[in-house]
């Protein structure tokens, strides 16, 4: 049987950026890697209901900068920025260095593989029929401009005695084309029958400029907790 390489891993440095960008010498590398793992584990647990897509980590000059990409920034920031301040203190304590937290909004959650996979998994846990959940996700993605999408679920589907896999695809998903912008992610649905795995591939088009084009597109400033405006008038 032909096996598939991880679509994100093979595209790192070609059209996909790294989730952790820092340099460390031999002594500090293991500590930094362990710190990144613990920070991500903590934030994913705390923000389980905040539709978090991915968490990027930078380490400039004995500090840590965490960017949380989420479809619901209001939940992460909290009332007057209280929640994000608690997260900042907790991350600083875990990493052992001063922390800064930025929030980046995911404008189209229907085109984000992680959020789509989480959505399908939560529907399966609520006993929605798996075919209906898959088709709904595919239709929403194609409606919002995806060039192609593939969804696969595997496990005891519908409470069947024998586990199996089913998939549904629409459009193109060219896994062999390295310049193709393919977003891939997974999720798990914990049902009464057992665990059902969900995999999502979303093809958004081809990136012709390589990493330079990717970096340019990601230069939009991350959202910060906003203060209430003083005046009511508009310019």
From Swiss-Prot:
Signal peptide: none annotated. The keyword Lyase does not apply. GO terms for cellular component: cytosolic small ribosomal subunit. GO terms for biological process: translation. It comes from the Bacteria. Binds the lower part of the 30S subunit head. Binds mRNA in the 70S ribosome, positioning it for translation. Part of the 30S ribosomal subunit. Forms a tight complex with proteins S10 and S14. This is Small ribosomal subunit protein uS3. It comes from Actinobacillus pleuropneumoniae serotype 5b (strain L20). The gene is rpsC.
């Amino acid at each position: 049987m032909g096996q598939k390489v991880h679509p994100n891993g093979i595209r790192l440095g070609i059209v996909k950026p790294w989730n952790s960008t820092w340099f460390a010498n031999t002594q500090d590398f293991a500590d930094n890697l362990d710190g990144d793992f613990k920070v991500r584990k903590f934030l994913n647990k705390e923000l389980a209901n905040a539709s978090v897509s991915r968490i990027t980590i930078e380490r400039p000059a004995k500090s840590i900068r965490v960017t949380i990409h989420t479809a619901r920034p209001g939940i992460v920031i909290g009332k007057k920025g209280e929640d994000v301040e608690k997260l900042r203190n907790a991350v600083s304590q875990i990493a052992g260095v001063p922390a800064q937290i930025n929030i980046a909004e995911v404008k189209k959650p229907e085109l984000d593989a992680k959020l789509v996979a989480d959505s399908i998994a939560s529907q399966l846990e609520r006993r929605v029929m798996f075919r209906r959940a898959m088709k709904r996700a595919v239709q929403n993605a194609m409606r919002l401009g995806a060039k192609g999408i593939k969804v696969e679920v595997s496990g005891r589907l519908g409470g069947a005695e024998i586990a199996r896999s089913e998939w549904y695809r629409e459009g193109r998903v060219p896994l062999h084309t390295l310049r193709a912008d393919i977003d891939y992610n997974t999720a798990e649905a914990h049902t009464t029958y057992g665990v059902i795995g969900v995999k999502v591939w979303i093809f958004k088009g081809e990136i012709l400029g390589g990493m330079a084009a990717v970096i340019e597109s990601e230069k939009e400033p991350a959202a910060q907790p906003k203060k209430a405006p003083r005046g009511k008038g508009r310019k």
